[in-house]
Amino acid sequence: MGRSRSRSSSRSKHTKSSKHNKKNRSRSRSRSREKERARKRSKSRESKRNRRRESRSRSRSNTAPSSRRDRERERERASSPPDRIDIFGRTVSKRSSLDEKQKREEEEKKAEFERQRKIRQQEIEEKLIEEETARRVEELVAKRVEEELEKRKDEIEREVLRRVEEAKRIMEKQLLEELERQRQAELAAQKAREEEERAKREELERILEENNRKIAEAQAKLAEEQLKIVEEQRKIHEERMKLEQERQRQQKEEQKIILGKGKSRPKLSFSLKSQD
């Protein structure tokens, strides 16, 4: 009886402990599942955030915000996800999220600084490479030119002499043409001067002829006027002579009348008788 009781009690204890173990195992399994789900959710969120950050960094690099304020706003929007949940399904505190945000900003600043440093370093290296390449190319070109000149020295001298002779011939031809143009220009100028002088002489002769004609006309007119004056003077003189003769005649007649020599009065005779 005692053994059966002990066995039954042990069996009941065993069943209770097994039930309790099953419950614990089921709880641990559910917890592990929740942990796994939370881990997956956090991973998916992290991957989404990373993708968002990458896309925003690309958009920032493409659009190039015009000021630090715009970049800070972009960074805040990129680094302000909803409340995070830990593996136990609990929300992470704001302080830890702020710390993570600050840490993330510092890491982004460091990454940006490192990227800018690498870009500057790459630009400096590219510039140095470009300068070195240009210097080497210049040296190589100068060396090749010098070698080519040395090889073709005689040919170059002959070509230079030929070009000098050709230039001399061209210059002589141009000089002769210039002298001929000057001579033709001088002849044309001389002809123009002679033509101008001839025209001036003809104009002077015409003016002299016109003056002589006017003088002759004036002289003829003056002579005619003088003849008229002489004729007038002659007429005046004749008229004066006529008047003088008429006056003398009248005077004589008056004297005759006064003296009685005319037929109108008898003649008076005076005789002296002689005494014996």
Curated annotation (Swiss-Prot):
> Which stretch carries the motif LXXLL motif 2?
204-208
Renumbered to this chain, region (Necessary and sufficient for RNA binding) spans 1-77
Alphabetically list the UniProt keywords.
Chromosome, mRNA processing, mRNA splicing, Nucleus, RNA-binding
Where is the protein found, in the record's own terms?
Answer: Nucleus; Nucleus speckle; Chromosome
The annotated regions of Basic and acidic residues compositional bias extend over: 67-87, 96-117, 240-256
Query: What molecular function terms (GO) are annotated for this protein?
Result: pre-mRNA binding; transcription coactivator activity
* Residue positions of motif LXXLL motif 1: 175-179
Give me the Gene Ontology terms describing cellular component. chromosome; cytosol; mitochondrion; nuclear speck; nucleoplasm
Q: Where is the composition biased (Basic residues)?
A: 1-30, 38-59
Specify the superkingdom: Eukaryota
State the InterPro entries in the record. ARGLU1
Main role?
Dual function regulator of gene expression; regulator of transcription and modulator of alternative splicing. General coactivator of nuclear receptor-induced gene expression.
Q: Which family does it belong to?
A: Belongs to the ARGLU1 family.
The protein's name in its UniProt record: Arginine and glutamate-rich protein 1
> Top-down, what is the taxonomic lineage of the species of origin?
Eukaryota, Metazoa, Chordata, Craniata, Vertebrata
Q: Which gene encodes it?
A: ARGLU1
